[in-house]
UniProtKB/Swiss-Prot annotation:
Assigned keywords, A-Z: Lectin, Repeat
PANTHER family noted in UniProt: JACALIN-RELATED LECTIN 11-RELATED (PTHR47293:SF66), JACALIN-RELATED LECTIN 3 (PTHR47293)
Disulfide partners: none
Protein name: Jacalin-related lectin 4
GO molecular function, one term: carbohydrate binding
Family: Belongs to the jacalin lectin family.
Jacalin-type lectin domain sequence ranges: 2-148, 151-294, 307-448, 451-594, 601-744
PROSITE patterns in alphabetical order: JACALIN_LECTIN
Domain of life, per lineage: Eukaryota
Length: 745
């Protein structure tokens, strides 16, 4: 939703308003005289569905007469106004001068600023899309409408050969840039991006030469300026990138990476930070471009939610002990057992990278001592199984399970009563309980478990790729296969109910696929083989096979070879791949994350107009926030923020938000929940069969305001005694239909 800054300057004049139904500003006209600014005029542009800009000429605000007239032009395809600076005469109530700043350049001061009072119009991270104010024979005051600013793309500089690559503008920032350099050019660039707190790596070119890097103090530091040179490399006769240098939001300047050449280029966008690269590369970096996005320094991260404490289970008696929950991982477990039961336990932890040795709980005695070690870099404790003697009040046996392995039963479980410590989707970071001469009972502290990364298996050649851990699950895996190897892998991921496809390798050979019944089925096991391919003399992935949470086993894709590998993480599902590929799949690795099958929910059919593509957010525990965006014809987009196991789960945009942005309806979750949705729809010319024009949400406590305009065709979504726990529907650049998932209250 657009933000309106009230008019600033002198008092008086007649009110005028260009409104905010534009997408950008194309040209500014300012006429000045001895008294001050005589008039302003703004020409706008509005983009149609094909992204073709339609000009909209503005009106004159003030009075045109003898004076100097200056213009300031803006390229609406890649440029936008970020701020206005002005001066006014308070006694006369007239603006004396104006200066306009875009993401790429700044105008001259138009008028004069001698002894005037200064004002400014600026909202961090937003662009001006319209103006308003007061004027008579002169301009008295000026205000503006702001909308979220789009990223700025700088075209690549350098040669036009080699392979085109583009990382896009969907990252939050850059954490590190690394290089391979020789005496004449940049052979390789490696970028570590931040995406919602996780690192995603990309690399382009050949890893040949000396290694250098520039590390950012992200998220408090960003790259705000990039300078480079390019020229012909004599031994190849190709125009390539020869040097790069960066400046940051903290005033730091990087070293010059490479050798400075004749042709200089600069990428800089006022008030913006570098969030992505694109270019061309093969044996070296032939060309490079960049994306910049308005810079808003991150607020301090909210504190993590408190650990969940499971009360001690086992026998009665003993003295209370507590290792507390202020650790990051459990690294080693010591258990001493005897004839009566477990004599003592001891846990070693790590906190902020530093080892912490725990205390003995129980009494050291004669007995067998066993240890169980956990690698904190990629392994975590997910559960404990135990047995106790109720009459003696003593724990008799313990078994520990991580995301990768399970210990033996330490002690004995004959005729004992069983207990377990486990919270789905979480890991153990601390223990507590009761003990005296023996261990009487045991409890644990749980926090959300991180994804598990399995390093890629196969060869070390070809192009590195990494899909990361930001997907919800895998819907389908497809392959191109020949007689010896896997030539290509294609993955259909689920992300907020939408499908995102990634593919790596060459699409050569026969086609095979494995479809998962997501979201009720996940891949929980992956097995493969790799070996040297004789005709290429390269170690590559030769076969892959999968098992699912429903007990299904896929066919073997490819030809089984000698070197076997297995990826499996207890209680976890496959959510992402990484590896290396070019003409074939050279190597593959995987990410697994703890999963909880969604509860059984009832689907209520989507209502509204016809048209659009289907989408589904899936089923959650509840709804936290609702965002509704409006356009010319009706509801342009919706977005929902859910609760999933006490964690915030943000859905995707369904439809296309306009520069008006979103209106928000925030629920007092978990005490408040949605019971019904009311809506209207209508057939609108150009909307392809009908669009939803209004939505209104009713909770167990209140009713939201209507978002949009009511029409004669309406609908209600809901079921008595049920609450809404997810949404689905159809959309294009607008919202056509909306349906819901409901569960009993």
């Amino acid at each position: 939703m657009a933000q309106k800054l009230e008019a600033k300057g002198g008092k008086g004049g007649n009110q005028w308003d260009d409104l905010l139904d534009h997408d950008n500003i194309a040209k500014i006209h300012v006429q000045g005289g001895h008294e001050g600014i005589q008039y302003v005029k703004f020409d706008y542009v509005k983009f149609d569905n094909l992204k073709i800009g339609q000009p909209k000429l503005g009106s004159i605000h003030g009075l045109s007469r003898k004076g100097f007239t200056q213009t300031f032009e803006i390229d609406p395809t890649s440029e936008y106004i970020v701020s206005v600076e002005g001066y006014y005469d308070e006694s006369k109530g007239i603006i004396q001068a104006l200066k306009f700043k875009t993401n790429k350049k700044t105008s001259d001061m138009i008028g004069y600023d001698e002894n005037g009072l200064k004002f400014s119009l600026e909202v961090k991270g937003k662009a001006i899309i319209g103006f308003h104010g007061f004027a008579d024979t002169n301009l008295n005051s000026l205000g503006a409408y702001f909308a979220p600013a789009p990223p700025t793309k700088f075209d690549y500089q350098g040669g036009s050969g080699a392979q085109l690559w583009d990382d896009g503008s969907n990252y939050n920032g850059v954490r590190k840039v690394s290089f391979s350099l020789d005496d004449t050019e940049i052979r390789q660039i490696r970028i570590e991006y931040d995406k919602s707190g996780l690192v995603e790596k990309r690399e382009y070119g050949s890893n040949v030469g000396r290694q250098e890097e520039f590390v950012l103090d992200y998220p408090t530091e960003y790259i705000i300026y990039m300078e480079g040179t390019c020229d012909i490399v004599s031994d190849t006769s190709k125009n390539r990138v020869r040097s790069l240098m960066f400046k940051t939001s903290k005033g730091r300047t990087s070293p010059i990476f490479g050798k400075v050449a004749a042709r200089k280029f600069v990428f800089e966008s006022n008030g913006s930070a570098l969030i992505g690269f694109h270019g061309r590369a093969a044996a070296a970096v032939d060309a490079i471009g960049a994306y910049f996005s308005p810079l808003i320094l991150s607020a301090p991260a909210p504190p993590p939610p408190p650990a969940e404490k499971l009360q001690a289970k086992g026998g009665n008696g003993g003295n209370q002990w507590d290792d507390l929950a202020d650790h990051d991982h459990v690294t080693k477990i010591y258990v001493q057992g005897g004839q009566e039961g477990i004599q003592y336990v001891k846990f070693d932890y790590v906190k902020n990278g530093q080892p912490q040795s725990g205390s003995v709980h129980g009494l050291l005695g004669r007995g067998f001592t066993q240890t169980f070690e956990i690698d904190p870099t990629n392994e975590h404790l997910v559960s404990v199984e135990g047995y106790y003697d109720e009459s003696k009040g003593l724990v008799q046996g313990l078994k520990f399970k991580t995301n990768k392995k399970t210990s033996d039963m330490i002690g004995y479980d004959e005729n004992g009563l069983k207990f377990s410590l486990e919270v789905n989707g979480k890991k153990i970071i601390g223990f507590h309980g009761y003990a005296q001469t023996y261990l009487n009972s045991l409890g644990a502290y749980f926090v959300t478990a991180p994804p598990t990364k399995f390093d890629y298996q196969g060869g070390s050649g070809a192009q590195l790729w990494d899909d990361g851990t930001n997907y919800n699950g895998v819907r389908k895996i497809s392959f191109a296969l020949d007689a010896n190897e896997i030539r290509q892998i294609r993955i259909d991921y689920d992300k907020g109910g939408l499908i995102e496809r990634r593919e790596y390798g060459g699409n050569v050979g026969r086609q095979e696929e494995f479809v998962v019944d997501y979201p009720s089925e996940y891949i929980i096991y992956m097995e493969g083989t790799c070996d040297i391919v004789s005709d290429a003399s390269k170690n590559r992935v030769r076969s892959l096979m999968f098992k699912t949470s429903k007990g299904r086993t896929s066919p073997i894709f490819g030809k089984v070879a000698a070197r076997k590998f297995v990826f499996e993480s207890n209680g976890s599902a496959l959510i992402g791949f990484h590896g290396r590929a070019a003409a074939a799949v050279d190597a593959i690795g995987a990410y697994f994350s703890r999963f909880i099958l969604p509860p059984s929910a009832e689907t209520l059919q989507a209502k509204g107009g016809e048209g659009g593509d289907p989408w589904s957010d899936g089923v959650f525990n509840g709804v936290r926030n609702i965002y509704v965006g409006q356009g010319e014809n009706g509801v342009s987009a919706v977005k929902f923020v859910y609760d999933k196991d006490s964690q915030v789960a943000e859905g995707n945009d369904h439809g296309k938000p306009t520069l008006l942005g979103y209106e928000e309806f925030k629920l007092e979750y978990p005490s408040e929940y949605i019971t019904t949705v009311e809506g209207c729809f209508d057939k609108i010319f150009g909307s392809g069969g009908g669009v939803i024009t209004m939505l209104k949400f009713k909770t167990n406590k209140r009713t939201s305001p209507p978002f949009g305009l009511e029409t004669t065709s309406n609908f209600v979504l809901g079921k008595e005694g049920y609450k809404i726990v997810g949404f689905h529907g159809t959309s294009s650049h607008e919202l056509h239909q909306l349906g819901v998932y409901v569960m009993p209250i």
